[in-house]
A protein has these predicted regions:
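Short N-terminal "domain-start" leader segments
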Residues: 1-38
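Short intrinsically disordered terminal tails
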Residues: 1-4, 80-86
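A short, charged, amphipathic alpha-helix used as a generic interaction element across diverse proteins
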Residues: 10, 49-76
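N-terminal compositionally biased or targeting/leader segments
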Residues: 16, 59, 83-85
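Short glycine-aromatic motifs
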Residues: 19, 29, 67, 72-82
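Generic short amphipathic/hydrophobic targeting helices enriched at N-termini
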Residues: 26-27, 39, 59, 77
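Intrinsic disorder/low-complexity segments, especially N-terminal tails and targeting/processing regions
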Residues: 32-33, 45, 83
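Surface-exposed loop/edge segments in extracytoplasmic proteins
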Residues: 38-45
Length: 86
């Protein structure tokens, strides 16, 4: 299992996002809640079959979930999106 960080939503977001969607390896995009004092906690998991369309859709769902949590959470937590592959 490999986790790749694609986007980290911090209190001050860095501009820009870019990664390659042309792969055929199935996996999942995972939203993790992270803080400096606790272990990362999995909030959501969006699986994909590896096709560009399915992967793009799963990533979009994960980003929307992370952004909504970051916007409405009163705590100083980070919600980060990772891709898990075999």
């Amino acid at each position: 299992m490999t986790l790749t960080a694609y986007y980290q939503l911090r209190n001050t977001k860095a501009a820009g996002l870019g990664f390659e969607l042309l792969t055929s390896e199935p996996g999942a995009f995972i939203v993790l809640q992270e803080s400096s004092y606790e272990k990362p906690y999995e909030i959501a998991r969006y699986g994909h079959n590896g096709s560009a369309g399915d992967r793009s859709n799963a990533f979009s769902c994960a980003m929307n979930k992370a952004r909504s949590l970051q916007n409405y959470s009163g705590a100083k937590l980070d919600y980060n999106v990772y891709e898990e592959t075999a």
